[in-house]
Amino acid sequence: VYDVSTEQLGTFDLVFVGSLLLHLRDPVLALERLRAVCHDRLQVVDCVDPMLDRFGRWFSGARFQAGDGRMEWLVPNRRCLGQMVEAAGYVDVSVGRRFTIPFRATRGGVAHASVTARNPSALAD
């Protein structure tokens, strides 16, 4: 994902990123690189840590867990996930409500959130 280019893939009106960012060492860089192929809208659906939301809606943070044998680098809360998209240069960022996706390995499933945004270059068209 760090090496995507318009020469390889062209551009897309919608780029969907699903349960990917938590597995990347630099998720903001990945989102920045995806802007090259994102003509207009970005939709991110990824894991979030509901425990971090308990600190209040203005708290932005992530649980770093690399090195403990898991495949995830970090799991943000909803606010942090939205700020990662903003930091990657997208605009009109909107963070949706938290929801749970059933997963057999965990009781109760895995918390996720959805973020929608636009590539600022689409607004100039």
Predicted regions and their residues:
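S-adenosyl-L-methionine-dependent methyltransferase catalytic module, highlighting the catalytic core
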Residues: 1-9, 16, 25-123
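Short catalytic micro-motifs in class I SAM-dependent methyltransferases
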Residues: 14-20
